[in-house]
């Protein structure tokens, strides 16, 4: 049985395998950065199968005006079992009073469909555009 557990502190060694399993190499090639990112998160929810971490959702922000979903990961063999939805629902329930919850994801039919099913809309729906700045030297 899968359980969802809210954490304020998560150790790198407990979740690195998740990032590796989905190929998020920007994190796996910079474990120190990931460790700092984990420790500076607003909150992290873990999906546990017994003691094994099989998924997570990591939020950053102030928790009031802006909450950003920095990552939602479920091990590939556990995907399509409702774990990602359960993680997102738990996060949205806890931050239901936040002015806005945002995220950035790859533009695939699967991703857009999933996040729309969770109540998210593409920014152009609100006549907005998203922008990002990335340090390309790292």
Where are these regions (language model features)?
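Short amphipathic alpha-helix that is part of the acyltransferase structural core
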Residues: 1-28, 126-127
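A short helix-loop-beta-strand connector motif used in the catalytic cores of GNAT acetyltransferases and
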Residues: 35-46, 99-100
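Conserved beta-strand in the GNAT
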Residues: 46, 52-61, 65-73
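Conserved acetyl-CoA pyrophosphate-binding loop and the N-cap/start of the following alpha-helix
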Residues: 78, 82-87
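Short glycine/proline-centered loop/turn elements that form peptide/ligand docking sites
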Residues: 88, 109-111, 131-133
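Conserved GNAT acetyl-CoA-binding A-motif
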Residues: 94-106
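Conserved active-site alpha-helix within GNAT-family acetyltransferase domains
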Residues: 107-128
